[in-house]
């Protein structure tokens, strides 16, 4: 689908950024990139290992470099890591390069979606529910401040979310298009 800008998905772990991003890219006939997967491919190691060896600050440095690179591409769909909005440089780069969509979800939904995932380093730091609640309190305002659109994902299928993103992004791109 021509005419739509790069679409950048932000939101917490378990919001569906990767799943929705892949479907959205296929629907729009665009390339899809997941910044966390790109970091893993480039490093030859998973995120948990990078956190263990370099700490969160080391990972965030890699993430910032990767986001700059991926956000510079034209007309792609980009799924970011949940903590990408923690740095102002990242928020600014994302806002400047495309339409930012916050995939908002409840902590309860996050718990259901991440319960068996062992590759989430931040969830290994104590009670996962409390960690998710603390992350939500810190990050939700940043997601909202960065986003052009907020789309809820709770109790919705990925296809319905994709359709809403396309419809609302078209409306943002051309507010006079009455069919959008």
Swiss-Prot record:
InterPro entries: P-loop_NTPase, Shikimate/glucono_kinase, Shikimate_kinase/TSH1, Shikimate_kinase_CS. It comes from the Bacteria. Belongs to the shikimate kinase family. GO terms for cellular component: cytosol. GO terms for molecular function: ATP binding; magnesium ion binding; shikimate kinase activity. Substrate binds at residues 36, 60, 82, 139. This is Shikimate kinase. Binds 1 Mg(2+) ion per subunit. Its EC number is 2.7.1.71. SUPFAM superfamilies: P-loop containing nucleoside triphosphate hydrolases. Its main location: cytoplasm. It catalyses: shikimate + ATP = 3-phosphoshikimate + ADP + H(+). The keyword Kinase applies. Pfam families: SKI (PF01202). NCBIfam families: PRK05057.1. Its cofactor is Mg(2+). GO terms for biological process: amino acid biosynthetic process; aromatic amino acid family biosynthetic process; chorismate biosynthetic process. Keywords: Amino-acid biosynthesis, Aromatic amino acid biosynthesis, ATP-binding, Cytoplasm, Kinase, Magnesium, Metal-binding, Nucleotide-binding, Transferase. ATP binds at residues 14-19, 120. Monomer. The lineage of its organism: Bacteria, Pseudomonadati, Pseudomonadota, Gammaproteobacteria, Oceanospirillales.
